[in-house]
Amino acid sequence: MTIDNKKILIPIVWKYVETYEHKRAVQTSIDRYKLRLDSSSNIKEWIEEYEYDPLYELVRQTMLTEKIINSEDDEFPVDDYIHINVIPEGNIELRSEIECYPKGLKDSSKFIVIDPRQLMMPIKDLYRDLYNYLEERYRK
């Protein structure tokens, strides 16, 4: 919760060594998402690049997050979101493939790409065993 009592949904996607084949998504699926994109979305407009992963995956995640926020759920009300993608700095290919995504957003501050070490730094001293486990597990 923020200082002004807003509840923030934080979808986190962890990527390490993923690569994508850049296959175009199925047309019926593309059409479904294009039709649901409206002026309330943080996505400015549909562009052809969104029809290929990894951008297609990011669009779907963003739209799902927005759907949750707009659902006005009484049990789990959410006011806003920050979409976090955890990608090692060494995965240059994936980082370069998604670097255009924030440019297609009305508010690019809602999309963050962060290295796992940087994300885990706040727990390093307090949860040393967890930090060491994650460091070892995802070092490769």
Stretches with model-predicted labels:
Residues 1-3, 139-140:
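Basic, amphipathic N-terminal segments that precede the first structured/catalytic domain
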Residues 2-11, 19, 66:
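Active-site beta-strand-loop-beta-strand hairpin of nuclease catalytic cores
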Residues 12-13, 81-89:
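Extended hydrophobic secondary-structure segments that form protein cores and membrane-embedded regions
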Residues 21-83:
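Acidic, metal/cofactor-coordinating or nucleic-acid-engaging core segments within structured domains
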Residues 88, 95-140:
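Polybasic (Lys/Arg-rich)
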Residues 16-19, 89-92:
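Short, solvent-exposed loop/turn segments at secondary-structure junctions
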Residues 22-24, 65, 92-100:
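A short acidic (Asp/Glu
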